[in-house]
């Protein structure tokens, strides 16, 4: 990698050798997108494309957060259509998968340490309630996702319609609140969740058939999934969990999102905003 200088923003950023920018092609018409075999993927794509088109400004947004998850695949894809020889913006990943999305779409790659102030960030969610409070962390990237989203001047959520809760968090998402913990503390945290916070159930997330043992985050921590049922006061729950010794971060994103776009298989998009 080598450093180039952004004349518009007066900020240096990382450029990728071997990536040659070409003349910009017209953006894909949202009404003429080729159909996908999976209707759920179509819902994710239309939500992501709409969110980018209605909120991203290549002239003013020079540092863009790119989240993790299956819907953000289409965010990166759409952002890639904005990149040409006259466009100058850098993308900040929230984890390994996010970094690969940025690279595969020939976008400029940066890091949050270099760009602590993010102009706009896009990310998915596991569930969104009526007040735009979120549960995130199903992909085990919650700490870095929260670091980027809270560093952004504008945070936009993209998801398919299944992620929209009719009222409370925990209504649709039944896997619990993801909590990132220091590995040596997991036994203590599990005990405190049950005995101090009356958690219904809590367990360390396992790696599945591909890995023996717990999921390990990009920060080398464990994830605990804690079921509290329907969460009527996510702000207080977040604060209570954060006070437990060993907790790094929770998957409750409070007062962070500005808008949420929910895609439907029929091609419609529902916009929820404060």
UniProtKB/Swiss-Prot annotation:
Q: Which UniProt keywords apply?
A: Cytoplasm, Isomerase
Q: Does the keyword 4Fe-4S apply?
A: no
Superkingdom: Eukaryota
Q: Which GO terms describe its biological process?
A: D-ribose metabolic process; pentose-phosphate shunt, non-oxidative branch
Keyword Cytoplasm attached: yes
Compartments reported by the entry: Cytoplasm
Give me the reactions it catalyses: aldehydo-D-ribose 5-phosphate = D-ribulose 5-phosphate
Which CDD domains does UniProt cross-reference here? RPI_A
Read off the Pfam families from this record: Rib_5-P_isom_A (PF06026)
According to its UniProt record, where is this protein mainly located? cytoplasm
Q: In which pathway does it act?
A: Carbohydrate degradation; pentose phosphate pathway; D-ribose 5-phosphate from D-ribulose 5-phosphate (non-oxidative stage): step 1/1
Q: Which GO terms describe its cellular component?
A: cytoplasm
E.C. number, please?
5.3.1.6
- Name of the protein in its database record: Ribose-5-phosphate isomerase
Say which species the protein is native to.
Kluyveromyces lactis (strain ATCC 8585 / CBS 2359 / DSM 70799 / NBRC 1267 / NRRL Y-1140 / WM37)
